[in-house]
């Protein structure tokens, strides 16, 4: 559903931020 899509997008965003901090 919509909530699953929101959670998925939030997870992708968080992963991107973490990768940005690491590098």
From Swiss-Prot:
One GO term describing the cellular component: extracellular region
Transmembrane segments: none
Summary of the tissues where the protein is detected: Expressed by the skin parotoid and/or rostral glands.
Localization in the cell: Secreted
Entry keywords, A to Z: Amphibian defense peptide, Antibiotic, Antimicrobial, Secreted
Biological process according to GO: defense response to bacterium
Principal localisation: secreted
Functional description taken from the UniProt entry: Antibacterial peptide, that adopts an alpha helical conformation which can disrupt bacterial membranes. Each caerin displays a different antimicrobial specificity.
Family indicated by similarity: Belongs to the frog skin active peptide (FSAP) family. Caerin subfamily.
Protein name: Caerin-4.1
Organism: Ranoidea caerulea
